[in-house]
Amino acid sequence: MHGITYDPVHDEFTVPQQFGQAILTYRGGANGEERPIRIIQGPHTQLDAPEHLDVDVAHNEIFVPTRQGSILVFARDGQGDVAPIRVLGGPDTMLGGDEPLVVDPVNNLLIVGGTAGRGQRRLLIFNRTDSGNVKPKAVIGGPKSGLYSFGGPFAVYPPKGEIIVSVRGPGPYEELSSDDAFVGVWSIHDNGDVAPRFTIGGPKGVLKMPRGIALDVKNRNMMVSDKRLNAVLTFHFPELF
């Protein structure tokens, strides 16, 4: 389980269950051994060991990447063995495997991680409602981008069109800590081999293996969890907002 999304409108949180081939939704105040209030599970779902997801509260949809290189979209209130309401996938999409994703509900975009060979990664930007074998409208990646193995779920700040990504760093030991790990910020308008507009971490920085990212808009802070440090770090980041 490498993804968890909180829905403040309905006070629910949703998680993927890799071994149960399921998407589980709990009430926000769940405690102890409590049953989920909804379960998406079964052969019609096409779920295959899901690890990541994002919930678009504005449009009541759940986005789930698959290991086969597709994105399954479900109704937020889906229950049981339900088929996705649409599927994004095919060779033109450049999707490949279960990579992190995030929805920008304001700018109507879907940002998905993709592979680029030799350990490099890229960001694929689609229209939120894209379905079938559709080419991304923009692709960010290349040596200048510094995109290697992704650390965890992405984040977006729609008012400024920003994409926030945790990157583990290059090399064959991407599962281990890296002095090159960083959090980078790109624009939804970027395309091609574009360097991040802002970075935290990098060569000899404090981050070793960044994973999750959360934004505290009110106080202009960014919180980053780091698996190797076993810590959550809070950075004051007014430039982001």
Where does each model-flagged region fall?
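Short beta-strand elements that form the blades of beta-propeller/WD-repeat-like
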Residues: 14-15, 64, 164-165
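Structural motif
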Residues: 21-26, 70-74, 119-125, 172-184, ...
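Beta-rich, blade/repeat-based domains predominating
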Residues: 1-10, 43-61, 91-109, 113, ...
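Short loop/turn segments immediately following the C-termini of beta-strands
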Residues: 18, 28, 66-68, 76, ...
